[in-house]
Amino acid sequence: MARIAGVNIPVNKHIVIGLRSIYGVGQTTAQKICADVNIDPTTKVRELTEEQLEALRSEVTKFKIEGDLRRDVTMNIKRLMDMGCYRGIRHRRSLPLRGQRTKNNARTRKGPKKPIKR
């Protein structure tokens, strides 16, 4: 297993697919990383040399990934909630944020139906 940014990359997949197992690295970012390091995207991870892996590790550290990205997303949501803006209130109440109707749908966001107490 190749280890990049604290994540085990599957060795039997192409490098572009393997890089996507890192939180915060998608298709476009993975292709950009491969282009910057001059590695063919269809190369399997097990075929990479140690120098290529080191180059990949140094290139990946330029992006905000894994724990830092998760922390930023959480802090952004917390900031909205503390601010008391519309989106923050919707987050606090566990309702949809982007204008979807909630009379009939939004069960995923609202959770299971609650029985009416008499």
Swiss-Prot record:
Q: Where is the segment annotated Disordered?
A: 91-118
Signal peptide limits? none
Taken from the UniProt entry, a GO cellular component term is: cytosol
Q: Which domain of life is it from?
A: Bacteria
Q: Which GO terms describe its biological process?
A: translation
Q: Which PROSITE patterns match?
A: RIBOSOMAL_S13_1 (PS00646), RIBOSOMAL_S13_2 (PS50159)
Alphabetically list the UniProt keywords: Ribonucleoprotein, Ribosomal protein, RNA-binding, rRNA-binding, tRNA-binding
Q: Which family does it belong to?
A: Belongs to the universal ribosomal protein uS13 family.
Q: What protein name applies here? A: Small ribosomal subunit protein uS13
Species: Hydrogenovibrio crunogenus (strain DSM 25203 / XCL-2) (Thiomicrospira crunogena)
